């Protein structure tokens, strides 16, 4: 009995560390939006409103899709336009969005942030402290960053 109880207590103590970290939620979904979960090969999971986004996940939005993501800690919002593919990477001090192609409209809050925010493209890296900006990467790899004053 004591051995079983010790096992259960140990399991409960380490269970949160065994689960992937939920970093954001999908707050809007229209059309073709798919997840590729960390460790998976394809974008096979159809995205649903309220879906948890885990560290290491990726999202692809098709020609007729749109989505919006809200980070749980600082309420930063990413609006995802059609034909966009990107991934999420979180470390202790940095939040990175790896934009392969497409358009992200970003509202990065400066209040409540504990991590730096970066957008990484095939040719550039942009880091912001709190602003609204768009990150655009064409299918040929040309990128643009457009900020709002």
In which residue ranges do the predicted regions lie?
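Flexible, surface-exposed loop/linker segments and immediately adjacent secondary-structure boundaries
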Residues: 20-149
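N-terminal secretory signal peptides that target proteins for export/translocation
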Residues: 1-2
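Bacterial N-terminal signal peptides
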Residues: 6-14
């Amino acid at each position: 009995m004591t051995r079983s109880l010790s096992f259960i207590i140990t399991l409960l103590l380490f269970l949160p560390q065994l689960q992937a970290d939920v970093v954001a939620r999908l707050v809007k979904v229209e059309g073709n939006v798919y997840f590729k979960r960390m460790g998976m090969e394809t974008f096979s999971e159809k995205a649903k409103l309220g879906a948890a986004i885990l560290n290491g996940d990726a999202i692809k939005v098709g020609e007729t899709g749109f989505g919006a993501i809200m980070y749980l800690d600082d309420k930063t919002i990413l609006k995802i336009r059609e034909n966009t593919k990107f991934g999420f990477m979180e470390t202790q001090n940095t939040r990175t969005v790896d934009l392969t192609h497409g358009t992200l409209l970003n509202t990065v809050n400066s209040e409540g942030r504990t991590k730096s925010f970066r957008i990484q493209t095939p040719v550039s890296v942009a880091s912001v402290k709190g602003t609204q900006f768009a990150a655009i990467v064409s299918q040929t790899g040309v990128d643009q960053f457009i900020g709002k004053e």
